[in-house]
Amino acid sequence: MSSAPFDLRVPAARRSGWRVKSASIAICVAVTVLFAAAPGFSQSESEQGQGRAVVTVLPKQEGALPPSVTGQDLSVKVNGKQARVTSWKPFQSPENSLELVLLIDDSARSALGGQFDSIKSFVKSLPPNTKTAIAYMQNGSAIFSGPLSADHAVVLRGLHLPGGFPGSSASPYFCLSDLAKHWPSADREARREVVMVTDGIDPYHMEYDPDDPYLQAAIADSVRARLVVYSIYWQGMGNASSSSYENNAGQSLLAEVTEATGGKSFWIGMGNPVSFQPFLAELTRRFRNQYELGFVSSLNGKPQIESMKLKLSTPGTEVDSPGQVMVYPAASAQK
């Protein structure tokens, strides 16, 4: 006697229930993917980064009153993406401390002594909230002649003629990296600014190469240390007979550093300037017209250096901002 075949079909009611559950699961998955991918939704704290930068805003017309600039006048992009301005305040309070290092190439020609009166007048004019020190580029290091101090007499005791030996600084970019890594203060709230007096020629890369590894290391170290770097061109011993190509290469390398950090390079042609006084006067004006920018941007987890572009809509102004900034995860942002 043959038995009836076993019916593998599922009752219609049960099949209907499965379809409902499957549809529900599919909808949930689709919504989850949509929310995760949609750019309009706010980032989590782990996806946000924060950073700070020193920005200089000057009136285009010399002698004009300082411009009135608010955070609404700014457009900031970090790594090519729009960033949100979280703070914008001028450094105009006596509590806004400034730390300044004059970093002099020890291979500079001894005629630099003719600029000492201008340097002394500049240091003596600095306000009480400014601590200054003088360091010399020697064998790839920044060698301080005294401590950071608001006492002008203490600072100027460290001013002396450079050694004037060809190549004694090694590379000026080694020395800047060393200064950035061993900044002589732990005050994270102070502005940190550097004035390099050098020809900028890297003896290990005599040509202009923006990818010079020593240059790029100096820029990265300066950005991490939040330095604003300026340079005053002054020829070194052994480089006086350098070709115009090599001198121009040195100036161009210095410009790479100053533009990346929000500073400025000063030079007049290929020779030494007659006087530092106009350059130092502009530095004083810049220190008086600086702002602290705070921003929030996207970040892929770990602290990293990002490119930054800042535009200012205030008419009659010019702005210098760093081309690179350090961005930290929002939850552990560095001050």
Which residues does each PLM region occupy?
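Bacterial N-terminal signal peptides
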Residues: 23-37
